[in-house]
Amino acid sequence: MTDSFAHCASHINYRHKMKTMFIFSTPCCSPSTAFFSPFRASNSKPLRSTLSLRSSISSSSITSTSHCSLAFNIVKHKEKNVVSANMTSSVSSRTFLNAQNEQDVLSGIKKEVEAGTLPASIAAGMEEVYLNYKSAVIKSGDPKANEIVLSNMTALLDRIFLDVKEPFVFEAHHKAKREPFDYYMFGQNYIRPLVDFETSYVGNMPLFIQMEEQLKQGHNIILMSNHQSEADPAIIALLLEMRLPHIAENLIYVAGDRVITVPLCKPFSIGRNLICVYSKKHMLDNPELVDMKRKANTRSRKEMAMLLRSGSQIIWIAPSGGRDRPVANSGEWAPAPFDSSSVDNMRRLVDHSGPPGHIYPLAILCHDIMPPPLKVEKEIGEKRIISYHGTGISTAPEISFSNTTAACENPEKAKDAYTKALYDSVTEQYDVLKSAIHGKKGLQASTPVVSLSQPWK
């Protein structure tokens, strides 16, 4: 987050841009060549090994040779059918993209540290993520696990290294960068091999379909959700992309400052639509920055208000202000309590935006894939654990403020009652997902309130 913010109006684009990349083997030390083919929804399980990537360069000509401007700024260009090796090299350092095996990757990290181009602390994190990602993908049992790891990790390390050299600065409203490098597909393809789709579920899929219809009518959708891990946006998109690619690609996430400042997180954040804010949990970490953070949050709220006035927006927000943690006395994971002020501020923005608005409770269970530290930490640089596991999301019917608070005596009680209704719904749905995934009940965990399905089948 910085003090410079520019308004960037967003409009819904119903031309789906889902693209699948296929990597073809190349001779040793020669640049990998990437080709796109259109993504087609099917009734089969989401592809895993075929969706790994070495590079996500879009099929367009590029008008500059500067790697920093190519990586971080949208430039005018004309369509072309093929991406040349020179275009690929113009937006990357090649140190990691040229790696042919694990030894090349690890020696590349060491080489950049010795050259003084990569801080030792970031290098240690890169190596840790590589080894943990490798372990998780191998445990998935995919016969092409080693190829997937090399392809996806070299792409990630390349993007991290580029950002170290030319740090990307997020605006208050950040639009996912799809060109010349497709950061959205990069994130999808990186997280996909970590998801056990056989033990993953979506609750109340018809309601998600209803949301898409409301978006087409110009309505706004707000998802009041719990927050489990840095992988939440990718998990939501992966579980919806086969049936609802528009929602998967156009969801806007209210994001805390850590995911847009931590080098290991930034490449994934660049590929998502974001409203950038400072979390209440870290607002007072540095007293000297409190005033700046509050002013920045005010700017972000104004950006959000402008978006909502344009209509057809779907926004995800975690009113808890941070990720869920295990309950102290039991060690069980549960949604963190919602902050009533955050809920009320969001509701007021929707109510005063003009277009009709709908607020839905959303539950997500995915902490096993990238669990956060057991307690909130002030310092940046947490240990990054990665696992292969089933995941789930669920929504419930929208909750009306007026109906929920009709009997409340004053605004404060109304605010608390509405927050409780949303939180209770999220908790109820979360328990169903937990029963299906951790309790291994699968689709049989469905209840009259939550109907589980696997829409990718």
UniProtKB/Swiss-Prot annotation:
The keyword Repeat does not apply. GO terms for molecular function: glycerol-3-phosphate O-acyltransferase activity. One of its GO terms (biological process) is CDP-diacylglycerol biosynthetic process. Residues 1-88 form a transit peptide. Keywords: Acyltransferase, Chloroplast, Lipid biosynthesis, Lipid metabolism, Phospholipid biosynthesis, Phospholipid metabolism, Plastid, Transferase, Transit peptide. Pathway: Phospholipid metabolism; CDP-diacylglycerol biosynthesis; CDP-diacylglycerol from sn-glycerol 3-phosphate: step 1/3. It catalyses: sn-glycerol 3-phosphate + an acyl-CoA = a 1-acyl-sn-glycero-3-phosphate + CoA. A motif (HXXXXD motif) lies at residues 227-232. It comes from the Eukaryota. This is Glycerol-3-phosphate acyltransferase, chloroplastic. It comes from Pisum sativum. The lineage of its organism: Eukaryota, Viridiplantae, Streptophyta, Embryophyta, Tracheophyta.
